[in-house]
From Swiss-Prot:
One of its GO terms (cellular component) is Golgi apparatus. One of its GO terms (molecular function) is magnesium ion transmembrane transporter activity. The gene is ZDHHC13. The keyword Cell inner membrane does not apply. Belongs to the DHHC palmitoyltransferase family. AKR/ZDHHC17 subfamily. This is Palmitoyltransferase ZDHHC13.
Length: 622
């Protein structure tokens, strides 16, 4: 922020709420309107030869400042408001002037202003990450406190400058450092900043969850409850904050919530307390380990029950309809007791596997006598075995999760910050790692995935660099299995049902096959549903891979970008599209009798542009 008007705001600053942001160099992405208006209202200095050194510093007029200092001005001398030149240079992000003043003897930790702050404090308030880096490199002490008792990390938390928080912690400043009242950054975040951040961001650095402050002896969870900060309460409970610690008044977080009559927080605390109590029972722990198996068994039984009701020996469809409604009502209750919320995302996967189970049983029991000895039978067996294999490989193979140790994360943060690249385009604020090219953070898996394609509902896993090729074969053999069952259904009806399609038409034919075997029609409908989506996805994937060289995420992102562009954006003209044969060779990592050779790229660790020898193209992130 520039200008003298903004500096006066900083001198008399009170710690109110600030909009969060993670812009370039740590500058808040959504700038305060008053500060923006103040910047626009600043007068232009046409003649800088007569301005004083304070104004020259504020406006970054280096030559005028150098002239006055060399004429004898003491760079340590504060102005009438007790603000040094280094303060003015720091708040206005004048890097060259800071270097010059320090070289002329300026005290890097000189206190000044109404809040008795250091230049580092002023730079942090405005979110100037390059200035923070420069001051620390010249010996600024981040542990010093201002007149309100806040150190550097506390100010960064209050003003929600996540890049500065990450940089300070990576430079060995304690995430549990206390202010004058004994409050840690996590306490301040939970109490002063309403919302999920920076509480969630701080939790990634493993702060102490159960430490208490000096005066009230509140934990971070106490402070979040006191402020009614629902998002912070959720984050702290997920991290494992204690529910039993009492403050100086003998109150637990639940007691405080009851006093404040915040019904949502009361519900959250009681639910968490109940879950932690259940964890003590061996049966409950066993059920949690078997949640996915129980979900699969529930799906298998439910699908059998639906088919059994449809095949029930009764002409009353009203009775069958009532039984189906009752069945769905009962099955909707079971997951609430047997399966946790996080594992409900695997419901489509359980539905798919249950469908395949009953498809196989139907083929073996009903269709096998009509197709025994035929090549179609062996083709079906091969297809279903291959489907199960590639489903397992898609599910079990690492899709390309990016991993880094705590020390590597801190080194990456420091490196990115000091090169001016600590922003959301190159740094993942969830994983605290440098993002490889073509990667994306999956919020379901809570990890960055290399060459991210999608999070597949049907496999319950991300599709990325490591398992994308398995996913293609999974779709192919699923289409094959469903195609064979559709074929087998018509063979079964032609052999076992008296149909008059040619004489009476389609409607009569449908009534005849429903009356003949509702179960087979039910299985046919399941097979048709899975055949439809799997074939569509397979064709879409092959088109993207062979003709575009893009992932699903990249294609969707480019289509969204094209809506806001004046010129038409061609999906074929991207650096990743190297031609039909080369795209396939690179994707499946196989050549074609020496005519096409694949280019081996490890997308889990590819951070820079890649030179492709096949077409002499440079690959860039879409």
């Amino acid at each position: 922020m520039e200008g003298p008007g903004l500096g006066s705001q900083c001198r008399n600053h009170s710690h109110g709420p600030h909009p969060p942001g993670f812009g370039r160099y740590g500058i808040c992405a959504h700038e305060n309107k008053e500060l923006a208006n103040a910047r626009e209202a600043l007068p232009l200095i046409e003649d800088s030869s007569n301005c004083d050194i304070v104004k020259a510093t504020q406006y970054g007029i280096f030559e005028r400042c150098k002239e006055l200092v060399e004429a004898g001005y003491d760079v340590r001398q504060p102005d009438k408001e007790n603000v040094s030149l280094l303060h003015w240079a720091a708040i206005n992000n004048r890097l060259d002037l800071v270097k010059f003043y320090i070289s002329k003897g300026a005290v890097v930790d000189q206190l000044g202003g109404d809040l008795n702050s250091t230049p580092l404090h002023w730079a942090i308030r405005q979110g100037h990450l390059p200035m923070v880096i420069l001051l620390l490199q010249h010996g600024a002490d981040p542990t010093l406190t201002d007149g309100e008792g806040f150190s550097s990390i506390h100010l960064a938390v209050l003003f929600q400058h996540m890049p500065i928080i990450a940089y300070l912690i990576s430079k060995r400043q304690s995430v549990n450092m206390t202010d004058v009242n004994g409050q840690t950054p996590l306490m301040l975040s939970a109490h002063k900043v309403i919302g999920p951040e920076p509480t969630g961001f701080l939790l990634k650095f493993n702060p102490s969850l159960n430490v208490v402050d000096k005066i009230h002896q509140n934990t971070p969870l106490h402070w979040a409850v006191a402020a009614g900060n629902v998002n912070a309460v959720d984050k702290l409970l997920e991290a494992g904050s204690s529910l039993d610690i009492q403050n100086v008044k003998g109150e637990t977080p639940l007691d405080m919530a009851l006093q404040n009559k915040n019904q949502l927080i009361i519900h959250m605390l009681k639910t968490e307390a109940k879950m932690r109590t259940n964890q003590k029972f061996r049966l409950w722990r066993w059920l949690q380990k078997c949640e996915l198996f129980l979900l699969l068994m529930l799906s298998v039984i439910t699908m059998w029950a639906v088919g059994y009701i449809l095949d029930f020996n009764s002409d009353s469809w009203l009775l069958k309809g009532c039984l189906l409604v009752t069945l769905f009502f009962l099955t909707s209750l079971f997951p609430r007791f047997l399966v946790g919320y996080k594992n409900l995302i695997y419901l489509p996967t359980a539905f798919l596997l249950s469908s395949i189970f009953w498809i196989f049983m139907t083929w073996f029991i009903l269709f096998f006598p009509d197709l025994a000895g035929a090549p179609f039978y062996f083709s079906f067996i091969f297809s279903i075995v291959a489907f199960l294999y590639f489903f397992y490989k898609t599910w079990a193979t690492d899709p390309g999760f990016t991993k880094a140790s705590e020390e590597e994360k801190k080194v990456n943060i420091i490196t990115l910050a000091e090169t001016g690249c600590l922003d959301f385009r190159t740094f993942c604020t969830s994983c605290l790692i440098r993002k490889p090219l073509r990667s994306l953070h999956c919020h379901v898996c809570n990890s960055c995935v290399a060459r991210y394609d999608q999070h597949c509902l049907w496999t319950g896993r991300c599709i990325g660099f490591g398992n994308h090729h398995y996913y293609i074969f999974f779709l192919f053999f699923l289409s094959m299995v469903c195609g064979w069952i559709i074929y087998g259904s018509f063979i079964y009806w032609s052999n076992h049902c008296a149909t008059t399609f040619k004489e009476d038409g389609l409607w009569t034919y449908l009534n005849q096959i429903v009356a003949c075997s509702p179960w087979v029609l039910y299985i046919l409908m399941l097979a048709t549903f899975h055949f439809s989506w799997s074939t569509f996805l397979l064709l879409n994937q092959l088109f993207q891979i062979a003709f575009l060289g893009l992932t699903s995420h990249e294609r969707i992102s480019l289509l969204k970008q094209s809506k806001h562009m004046k010129q038409t954006l061609s999906l074929r003209k991207t650096p990743y599209n190297l031609g039909f044969m080369q795209n396939l060779a690179d994707f499946f990592q196989c050549g074609c009798f020496g005519l096409v050779k694949p280019c081996v790229v490890d997308w889990t660790s590819q951070y820079t542009m890649v030179f492709h020898p096949a077409r002499e193209k440079v690959l860039r992130s879409v």
